[in-house]
C-alpha cells in the first residue's frame, strides 16, 4: 500500500534530506519539537503571500539556523533588508536563542508541489473552477520539464451535496520507485461549502545514477 504513504516518508535518507537537522536528549526532545512547529507555523502564516514551500531548521547549542525557501524572496527580505531583520527579532524573542536566517529563492515555483497546491486552493477560494485550475497547473508543470504530475481535489466540489475526490494526472508518477524524485504538497481551500483538500505529486525525474556497465577486455586472459 505504498500509495497511501507520504512520499517523503519513504525517501528521507534516500533521495530527500531532513527538514529538521538537530539532535536532543529524550527529556529535551518534546520542547524542541514544539518550538520547531511554532517557528514553522509562524513563518508560514506571516509570509504566506511570499510562497514558502519549505523551511529547514538546523540547531547548534544556543543557535538556530533557518533556511526559508521562497518563490518571492523580495517579500521576505523587504526594503533594505528590514523585513528579514524584523522577522529575525520576532523569532529570537519567541525562542530566546540566536537566530540566523537564510533566504533561498525557488527558481521554478510551477515545479514545487506545495506551491502548486496552494495556488490551486487560492483559485478555488476565488470561485474559479477547480477543473480549470488543475488542468492549468498540469500544463505549466509539464511545459517546464516535469516527468509527471498528479493532482487530487477532495470535498464538496462545486458545492455538491455529496463530497467526492477528482483526480487528474499526466506523465509518469511512480509512488514505489525510491530513486524517483517525487515532490508532494498539500493545501486546503476554505469555501462557503466547507474545506476542499488539494494534493499534488510532481515527478522531477530520477536522482540516483544508473549503474555503469563494466566493459572487460576479451584479450589478455
Swiss-Prot record:
Subunit composition and interactions: Part of the 30S ribosomal subunit. Forms a tight complex with proteins S10 and S14.
Free-text function comment from the UniProt entry: Binds the lower part of the 30S subunit head. Binds mRNA in the 70S ribosome, positioning it for translation.
Pfam families referenced in this protein's UniProt entry, alphabetically: KH_2, Ribosomal_S3_C
InterPro entries, alphabetized: KH_dom, KH_dom-like_a/b, KH_dom_type_2, KH_sf_prok-type, Ribosomal_S3_C_sf, Ribosomal_uS3_bac-typ, Ribosomal_uS3_C, Ribosomal_uS3_CS
Lineage: Bacteria, Bacillati, Bacillota, Clostridia, Thermoanaerobacterales
BP terms from Gene Ontology: translation
Chain ranges passing through the membrane: none
The family this protein is said to belong to: Belongs to the universal ribosomal protein uS3 family.
PANTHER family tied to this protein: 30S/40S RIBOSOMAL PROTEIN S3 (PTHR11760), SMALL RIBOSOMAL SUBUNIT PROTEIN US3C (PTHR11760:SF19)
Molecular function GO terms recorded: mRNA binding; rRNA binding; structural constituent of ribosome
Domain KH type-2: 39-107
Annotated GO CC locations: cytosolic small ribosomal subunit
Gene behind this protein: rpsC
Keyword line: Ribonucleoprotein, Ribosomal protein, RNA-binding, rRNA-binding
SUPFAM superfamilies: Prokaryotic type KH domain (KH-domain type II) (SSF54814), Ribosomal protein S3 C-terminal domain (SSF54821)
Protein name, entry field: Small ribosomal subunit protein uS3
